[in-house]
């Protein structure tokens, strides 16, 4: 996914943004691939490495609470983080546990975005097996870490546009 905008102008806009990446670290190898793609995407678009903070949650279920905590942090009345990217993997097993975890994680992440009006994107892979997971963590289906990060970057632009539009 390539967002069409002036990359030179975008570097100025993004260079001062502070981003939190939350990694539900249950599947370490998979999550490492998601995290690396996310970090590379952020730096490619001008976000400085020292403005990217990575937080590790034990699993996907814990991501929304950590996202809410990070979204609520402020300095001098302004949000500490301009955007949050949630990454992880949940693989279907033999019980309904998969549905509960996936639904609550997705709902919780979206609620953070709505409540705090901070772009908070969902890069948690939810698949039926490890083969599908690998395919979406840098394999032939792309990398959900990169995709979620691009969605967050695009939302940063759109939120700024929405704030500055005059009708």
UniProtKB/Swiss-Prot annotation:
**Gene Ontology process terms (BP):** riboflavin biosynthetic process
For this UniProt entry, the molecular function terms from Gene Ontology, in alphabetical order, are:
6,7-dimethyl-8-ribityllumazine synthase activity
Its pathway, per UniProt, is:
Cofactor biosynthesis; riboflavin biosynthesis; riboflavin from 2-hydroxy-3-oxobutyl phosphate and 5-amino-6-(D-ribitylamino)uracil: step 1/2
- Cellular component GO terms, alphabetical: cytosol; riboflavin synthase complex
| Entries under SUPFAM superfamilies matching the protein | Lumazine synthase
* Key words, A-Z: Riboflavin biosynthesis, Transferase
Signal peptide feature range: none
Is Ribonucleoprotein set as a keyword in this record? no
What family does this chain come from, according to its entry?
Answer: Belongs to the DMRL synthase family.
Q: What does this protein do?
A: Catalyzes the formation of 6,7-dimethyl-8-ribityllumazine by condensation of 5-amino-6-(D-ribitylamino)uracil with 3,4-dihydroxy-2-butanone 4-phosphate. This is the penultimate step in the biosynthesis of riboflavin.
In Swiss-Prot or TrEMBL terms, this protein is called: 6,7-dimethyl-8-ribityllumazine synthase
Gene coding for it: ribH
